[in-house]
Amino acid sequence: MSDMELAELWVAVAFFVFVGILLYNGVHKALAKALDARGARIAAELDEARRLKEEAQKLVAEYKRKQREAEAEAEAIVTAAKAEAERLAAETKAKLEEFVSRRTRMAEDKIAQAEHQALADVKAFAADAAVQAAERILAASVPGTATGDRLLGQAIQDVRGKLN
């Protein structure tokens, strides 16, 4: 055996002795225990991460549901507001039409009253003119006697009664 082979042999022997000492002192148990603890810690972290992921998914689902509900509620509010606006517009239009109709009727009534009054004034004026004309004609045709004045007064009263 050469020196080189002898050195390799001693390194191998030293290695096996070292491993034997480690095994004898229970280092392998401590190492296994440390690895088991690390594995348990990693498993716990994975379980916690899984639990947090599920919780986050539940929260996301709940927020999406709330968002859909809020959108539906907003849409319902908009629909109700549009319906209310349409109702108010129709009500306002009806009130405006009623107001215009009432004002038109009032104007037509005033016009009819004015026409009636004008017609009555024209009739009264015509009656007075006819009476005055009749007075002049009768006064000219009948001399100024008491009977003539009486007949004239009676005729004037008859004409006034018929014309008015």
Curated annotation (Swiss-Prot):
Q: Which GO terms describe its cellular component?
A: plasma membrane; proton-transporting ATP synthase complex
Q: Where would you say this protein principally sits, based on its record? A: membrane
| Transmembrane regions | 4-24
Give the GO molecular function terms. Answer: proton-transporting ATP synthase activity, rotational mechanism; proton-transporting ATPase activity, rotational mechanism
InterPro entries to which the protein is assigned, alphabetical: ATP_synth_b/b'su_bac/chlpt, ATP_synthase_B_chain
Keywords assigned: ATP synthesis, Cell inner membrane, Cell membrane, CF(0), Hydrogen ion transport, Ion transport, Membrane, Transmembrane, Transmembrane helix, Transport
Location within or outside the cell:
Cell inner membrane
Question: What's the domain of life for this entry?
Answer: Bacteria
Q: Which family does it belong to?
A: Belongs to the ATPase B chain family.
Q: Which HAMAP family match?
A: ATP_synth_b_bprime (MF_01398)
- Biological role: F(1)F(0) ATP synthase produces ATP from ADP in the presence of a proton or sodium gradient. F-type ATPases consist of two structural domains, F(1) containing the extramembraneous catalytic core and F(0) containing the membrane proton channel, linked together by a central stalk and a peripheral stalk. During catalysis, ATP synthesis in the catalytic domain of F(1) is coupled via a rotary mechanism of the central stalk subunits to proton translocation.
Q: What is this protein called?
A: ATP synthase subunit b 1
Q: Which organism is it from?
A: Azorhizobium caulinodans (strain ATCC 43989 / DSM 5975 / JCM 20966 / LMG 6465 / NBRC 14845 / NCIMB 13405 / ORS 571)
- Gene assigned in the entry: atpF1
